[in-house]
A protein has these predicted regions:
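Conserved HGGG/HGGXW glycine-rich cap/lid loop of the alpha/beta-hydrolase fold
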Residues: 4-53
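Short beta-strand/loop motif that positions the catalytic acidic residue
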Residues: 193, 199-201
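Conserved alpha/beta-hydrolase "acid-adjacent" motif
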Residues: 206-212
């Protein structure tokens, strides 16, 4: 699978692959990428999103395999750092479990793992809801109506990309993404990955997501969980300065910003 990917930065610099969330495609990472010119940044549109829309349907295993193929084909060293947000962080976890040798260090924010006893029932229910035409219209209106409802400020130069993402994600294929994300459980083999990994959540996120970060960190020998003080789920996009400093600190093994704290 050949994903569309934006690329910037020096070819010889450490490579970082950015995996976007579930409502916006890869262009949404631009404010973060602009703050990290010292890295070679690869920003794919995941299957069924943006310019990789025709690579759908979205399935977690297929998405991780496509990212692995991207790293093998575009990164000469054969390894890359991985940064993920929300849906992209789930893909990052899957990649750590299935292709650990491809990942150097990772920063994964807002990762949701289904720990409920009846995973399939959850998938069926949410899939049914997301296939409902009324739900799609409500979602489309919600994403388009008020600037405050958007997951992050949308630059005027990116309005066309934003509207196209909304159009695609509110199509019938939305159910594929919802089902894959809702059914994501701890993948087999995650404990064998020794990639240093930071699982981070906004301190204002739901407690269940913070518990997911703690559980994921427990599965890996070199992982930790932290919280971004005063931040919500979308903080990687709404505060790109803090997020880019967090990523740079983790990737270089230096101190994290003071806003990144131990969970209480």
């Amino acid at each position: 699978m050949d994903l569309f990917a934006r690329e910037s930065g020096p070819v010889e610099a450490p490579a970082v692959v950015f995996l976007h969330g579930g409502n916006l495609s890869g262009w949404s990472w631009e404010p973060v990428v602009e703050r990290m010119p010292q890295y070679r940044c690869l920003v794919p549109d995941l299957p069924h999103f943006g310019r990789s829309f025709e690579q759908g349907p979205f399935e977690m295993g297929r998405a991780a395999a496509a990212v692995a193929e991207l790293i093998r084909s575009r990164v000469g060293a054969g390894r890359a750092h991985v940064v993920g947000f929300s849906l992209g962080s789930q893909v990052g976890v899957q990649l750590l479990a299935t292709e650990p040798k491809l990942v150097d260090r990772a920063v994964l924010s807002g990762t949701v793992v289904n720990t409920m006893p009846f995973v399939r029932s959850t998938q069926l229910l949410l899939g049914m809801i997301s296939r409902n035409g009324i739900y799609r219209r409500v979602l489309s209106r919600y994403l388009n109506s008020r600037p405050a409802s958007r997951p992050a400020p949308i630059p005027s130069a990116k309005i066309d990309e934003y509207r196209e993402d909304v159009r695609l994600i509110t199509s019938g294929q939305l159910a594929d993404v919802v089902v894959a994300s809702a059914g994501f459980t701890l993948p087999e083999g995650l404990g064998k990955s020794d990639s240093p990994t930071l699982f981070v959540t906004g301190a204002n996120e739901r407690s269940g997501i913070r518990r997911c970060a703690a559980e994921l960190a427990r599965q890996m020998p070199n992982a930790v969980d932290r919280v971004a003080v005063g931040m919500s789920h979308d903080w990687p996009l709404s505060d790109p300065d803090l997020f880019s400093r967090t990523v740079d600190g983790w990737l270089t093994g230096s101190a994290l910003p003071p806003e990144i704290a131990l969970p209480k």
